[in-house]
């Protein structure tokens, strides 16, 4: 066996296995291989296991007793935007809720204005900085939503920029159309008029140019109600798009139930999800993407991860990186929040940010585990054990990132 790259002297590999989301107690099923190696060829994992006596490779990396885990997958971000919203924090400290700020023209709409006024180069430069931060902290694949354009022209522009970013960044980008992020100012008194615009103009144009794999809707009070969300997602499904839903974040909006009924790939947030929503999601195989960074930043209750897992749901974790409710690119910090605030175990968390996160963007057959045939997206982390990643919070534990791009594996030394 000859490899392009051999990583040897690995203290232990921790990885989930398979291509499908791990549900309930199966999230604890982590393969542990001591004194291990990983061989890579043409950007994919050729073999991984107990270190053999000898293996030939063009390039070798001595892991020096570090731990190897799959590259992190962030299944929920709003990467492409301009400006920031630190001015809103003072309002939140005074007791204003997110919906209050949204109704005053703040929140999403203020970022929409800043993004519309930014040039392509400005948006690319800002996004690339964030992608570099993500990669250095171990995120190798990221889902990116539009939603700060809220017009046909601007939404298409943002989706085109995602494709450009995917071609120039080492991080793999999975695009999601989120024209239904908020009602734009020009449709403030005619929300159904905007829904019609999404259905009759935006979705056909997105599909015509093949710009997005997923369609998402913010199903929430102050954004799109249940019937509006249902209509948009049903239309997207007719066009062959896979579905996602911002579900039950601030109120019990029925988003989880809608996700199950329509067979969405994921339902995200779920702080207020109903019992019926959980059952319908479970039957449909919908992944629940939890976003504890939002709960931290908004000082709101966290999603009940333990309940969702014990009910047999597949749970993933994401940053929800955005300028208003979760301004962080650091998935390791999110993992620590899940560990302490949502009572998830280290093994559940690893599954949630690798295989289950990959399945939440329909990439479980390509990434999310360290197995033969998967992309060589691998992290070497300088920690004594898996729990230590979450326990010693607020710092970057990643030493080296191995990132598959095309038919090559690129080695990035973080520190």
From Swiss-Prot:
Cofactors required = Zn(2+); Fe(3+)
Q: Which pathway or pathways does this protein act in?
A: Amino-acid degradation; L-histidine degradation into L-glutamate; N-formimidoyl-L-glutamate from L-histidine: step 3/3
**GO cellular component terms?**
cytoplasm
Q: What is its main location?
A: cytoplasm
Q: What class of enzyme is it?
A: hydrolase
| Reaction(s) this enzyme catalyzes, per UniProt | 4-imidazolone-5-propanoate + H2O = N-formimidoyl-L-glutamate
What does the entry comment about cofactor binding? Binds 1 zinc or iron ion per subunit.
Alphabetized UniProt keyword annotations: Cytoplasm, Histidine metabolism, Hydrolase, Iron, Metal-binding, Zinc
In the UniProt record, the signal sequence range is none
> Where is this protein localized, as stated in its record?
Cytoplasm
Task: Offer one example of a GO biological process linked to this entry.
Answer: L-histidine catabolic process to glutamate and formamide
Q: Name the positions where 4-imidazolone-5-propanoate binds.
A: 85, 148, 181, 249, 325
> Which amino acids does the record list as binding Fe(3+)?
76, 78, 246, 320
Recorded hits in InterPro entries, A to Z, give: Amidohydro-rel, HutI, Metal-dep_hydrolase_composite, Metal_Hydrolase
| Protein's UniProt keywords contain Metal-binding | yes
Q: Which domain of life is it from?
A: Bacteria
- Reply yes or no: does the keyword Cytoplasm apply: yes
Q: Which residues bind N-formimidoyl-L-glutamate?
A: 148, 322, 324
**What are the binding positions for Zn(2+) in this chain?**
76, 78, 246, 320
* Record-level Gene Ontology MF annotations: imidazolonepropionase activity; iron ion binding; zinc ion binding
Protein EC: 3.5.2.7
What exactly does this protein do?
Catalyzes the hydrolytic cleavage of the carbon-nitrogen bond in imidazolone-5-propanoate to yield N-formimidoyl-L-glutamate. It is the third step in the universal histidine degradation pathway.
Identify its protein family: Belongs to the metallo-dependent hydrolases superfamily. HutI family.
Q: What is this protein called?
A: Imidazolonepropionase
Highest classification ranks of the organism? Bacteria, Bacillati, Bacillota, Clostridia, Thermoanaerobacterales
């Amino acid at each position: 066996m000859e490899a392009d790259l051999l990583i040897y002297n690995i203290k232990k590999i921790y990885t989930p296995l398979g291509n499908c989301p791990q549900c309930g107690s199966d999230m604890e099923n982590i393969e542990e291989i001591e004194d291990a190696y990983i061989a890579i060829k043409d950007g994919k994992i050729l073999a991984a296991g107990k270190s053999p006596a000898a293996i030939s490779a063009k390039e070798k990396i001595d892991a020096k007793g570090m731990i190897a885990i799959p590259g992190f997958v962030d299944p929920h971000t709003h990467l492409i935007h301009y400006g920031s919203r630190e001015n809103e924090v003072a309002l939140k400290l005074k007791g204003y809720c997110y919906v209050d700020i949204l109704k005053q023209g703040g929140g999403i709409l203020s970022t929409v204005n800043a993004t519309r006024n930014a040039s392509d180069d400005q948006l690319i430069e800002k996004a690339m900085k964030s992608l570099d931060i993500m990669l250095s902290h171990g995120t190798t694949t990221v889902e990116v939503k539009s939603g700060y354009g809220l017009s046909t022209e601007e939404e298409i522009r943002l989706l085109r920029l995602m494709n450009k970013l995917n071609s120039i960044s080492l991080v793999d980008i999975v695009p999601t159309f989120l024209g239904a992020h908020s009602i734009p100012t020009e449709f403030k008194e005619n929300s159904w008029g905007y829904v019609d615009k999404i259905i009759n103009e935006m979705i056909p144009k997105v599909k015509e140019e093949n710009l997005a794999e997923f369609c998402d809707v913010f199903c929430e009070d102050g954004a799109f109600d249940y019937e509006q969300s249902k209509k948009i997602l049903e239309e997207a499904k007719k066009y062959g798009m896979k579905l996602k839903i911002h579900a039950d974040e601030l109120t019990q909006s029925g988003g989880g139930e809608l996700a199950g009924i329509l067979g969405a790939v994921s339902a995200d947030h779920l702080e207020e999800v109903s019992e019926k929503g959980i059952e319908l999601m479970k039957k449909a195989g919908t992944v629940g993407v939890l976003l504890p960074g939002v709960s931290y930043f908004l000082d709101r209750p966290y999603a009940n991860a333990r309940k969702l897992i014990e009910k047999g749901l597949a749970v993933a974790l994401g940053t929800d990186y955005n300028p208003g409710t979760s301004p962080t690119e650091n998935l390791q910090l999110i993992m620590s929040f899940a560990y302490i605030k949502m009572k998830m175990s280290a093994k559940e968390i690893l599954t949630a940010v690798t295989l289950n996160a990959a399945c939440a963007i329909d990439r479980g057959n390509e990434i999310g585990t360290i197995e033969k045939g998967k992309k060589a997206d691998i992290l070497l982390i300088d920690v004594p054990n898996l729990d230590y990643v979450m326990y010693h919070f607020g710092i970057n534990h990643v030493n080296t990132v191995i990132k598959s791009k095309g038919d090559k594996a690129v080695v990035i030394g973080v520190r």
